[in-house]
Amino acid sequence: MVSPLAKGLFQKAIAESGSLYFPCRSLSTSHHGEETAEDLGVTFAENAGCASLAELRNLPADKLVQIADTADSGNFYKKSDEIVDGWVLPDQPLMISRRGEQNPVSVMAGFTANDGSVVALLGYAADIPDTAEAYTAEIKKRYGDLADKFLRLYPATDIDGSFYNALRDRSFGWMSESWVRHAAAVGAAAYLYYFAHIPPEGHVLAPIPGSDRQRPNGAAHGAECLYVLNDLESSPLSAEYPPTEKDFAMAEIMSDYWVAFAKAGKPEVDGLPAWKPYRNSACSYMRFEDAHAHPGENLFPGMWELMDEDVNRRLALPGVGRDYYAVGVSSPVLVVDQNYKSD
């Protein structure tokens, strides 16, 4: 979407796991105190005992993988993801999109109701306070003038639910809606979806990492994929949790929309509710739940604005770092002085 090298090579895109709007590592400039990609490469080469690119290229593939996934190599495998190299990626993807310089193709993007569960597995749920008072105090300490907005969206009346929803919105929600917003801003057809249909295994209780509490799996990360593919019975869970008539109906509806978009760049299906394109004024979206498609406008009012300001502060404040999953009581302190100006 944001690489000039891909211009004219594709006409449409579907994103079901957010977008690359978190800060990427740069080739030769350090950000947030992290190593540059070149520094990582030097450490990796030293650990491999190679003094040149030619020597690295002569290493067997299995040896490269073995060396890459070690602490001595700076965990190269885990850190050498997308690199702003000035060629494939000329700048941070978020900044390219905010300037309207991305490839203007049709876009469909969205997220699930319990997308936050996959982020919780990274360890952030261990920080959830036990009381409403402690939760509120942590939010006020970390968010300052944004605390009231945060608490309206993620109240202390349901601490676990609020924390999971904040994880969802901070990552997949904000990223997905940002993607369609930026596409719409350059005149491309853009469509936002929200998957809240509970799959058969969604009622199973799952432990909250770092605690002795549990909550239902719900519509977890990736739960929409088998519905989109209309292939529910291929799930390894289908024997223990067989799909119901509602599940099959939901799969038929979603796959019809996705196929229509893949064919023509518009999810228009005869006999199904009209899926309006996202506009930054109306913020149209489609919610998939209980075997039906429900068109709506302005999903989670105030969420995108709060999370976008959260991003701006992380980018502007020194020492905050690039860990964008840390949200709520796990967030860095985002309090700013009166001279701060948002993008």
Features from the language model and the residues they span:
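Primarily recognizes the serine-hydrolase "nucleophile elbow" in alpha/beta-hydrolase
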Residues: M1-C24
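Generic structural signal for alpha-helix termini and adjacent loop/cap motifs
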Residues: S3-P4, D231, F261-E268
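Active-site-proximal cap/loop segments of hydrolase catalytic domains
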Residues: E16-E34, G41-F44
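Substrate-gating cap/lid region and adjacent catalytic-acid/histidine neighborhood
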Residues: R25-L27, A51, E55-F248, Y257, ...
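Ligand-binding beta-strand-loop-alpha-helix segment within the catalytic cores
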Residues: A48
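C-terminal catalytic lobe of FAD-dependent flavoproteins
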Residues: M254
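Mature extracytoplasmic/periplasmic domains
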Residues: E268-G296
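Tryptophan-rich aromatic "cage" segments
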Residues: A291-D343
